[in-house]
């Protein structure tokens, strides 16, 4: 709803959601830079959290489906308008799942030490049982049902075809398409485009409190910690506050029930064909990765593991693995700790089916926290829209699909703020008011 008086919008979070929100606010037909003032508070740096360390996968088969088609198309539109192919690596990719059952003979005798077996047992959890691999929530049941058995593509030559028992391709063009962006490049480029239209990004500025009026019905100001000076500061007279703080959203708005889940990833230096590959790898019990064996440790996981690998432009391959629920969310993104051994596990598991990646240097080992909207222990969809407090908007809880669904989220939030409702998609199922958020 475009107001006749100066309108101040504050967004908490300089990741993909905060950046796309700022971008689409400045592109809305009602935006007037002389009366509309937009400030983005970021506790660390732009794309310093999951938005800079995610896989960047885009898929028409992603979830929630009320959001996905709009956002997938917006990615194509943004790439066409702003040269996304060059600026952030936008491209279509093949996508499928490989299934491999490995025997000791496949691993022994390899010159790579990480394939040697020393017969150690598996690490036991506290209950005495071997640890099972926990799958990332990337594919829901509907997406898994779209996989179709097919031949291993001839250009998917960075996977050892002799070990692959089954390959399932992700569906048909126009319905289950898959694309990708480089998440850090995309997020920082979108933030820069917003900044060029007048958005003010305050970095190292951690939002700590959203202040309401005396009746607790409307936003009035935002308090934040200027980490450079260690001084508390305020943005006064705000008319709208967008909480797009990823896993930290729940700390600003506890009723949102948004929390963080740590996940690790590695980046290989490898020039490989453009595929996103999901895996299901059965490992022989006696095999132990080299880094574990060298430390006299046991293998962490029992039989099956299913890491994911995405080829990227610029001679990169990105791999991610299971989430780690034991690590508490730190205060800011630059304080996230990476467990290097988990990254080494991930690289070792992928190396069992990809000699190319086994031989490739690893340029980064990293961790981030996925934002999850949780209710009674169950993961729900993201929260997008108005809350019970006038002027307070939620845009958080996107789990694995923040990069994919960021553009739609930003566009819809801009419609909420300027027009009072979402116009480009029906996202009633993501309504924060269903959960009385804001109270």
Predicted features, each with a name:
Residues 5, 229-240:
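Core beta-strand elements of the Rossmann-like FAD/NAD(P) dinucleotide-binding domain
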Residues 5-39:
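N-terminal Rossmann-like FAD-binding beta1-loop-alpha1 element of flavoenzymes
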Residues 17, 46, 248:
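Conserved Rossmann-like nucleotide-cofactor binding loop
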Residues 23-27, 56-58, 88-91, 239-390:
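Active-site substrate-recognition segment that forms the wall
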Residues 24, 36-37, 43-117:
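Conserved FAD-binding subdomain of flavin-dependent enzymes
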Residues 66-70, 173-193, 335-342, 400, ...:
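Short beta-strand to alpha-helix junction loop
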Residues 81-82, 90-91, 97-203, 209-217, ...:
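Flavin (FAD/FMN) cofactor-binding and adjacent substrate-gating region
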Residues 349-439:
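C-terminal catalytic lobe of FAD-dependent flavoproteins
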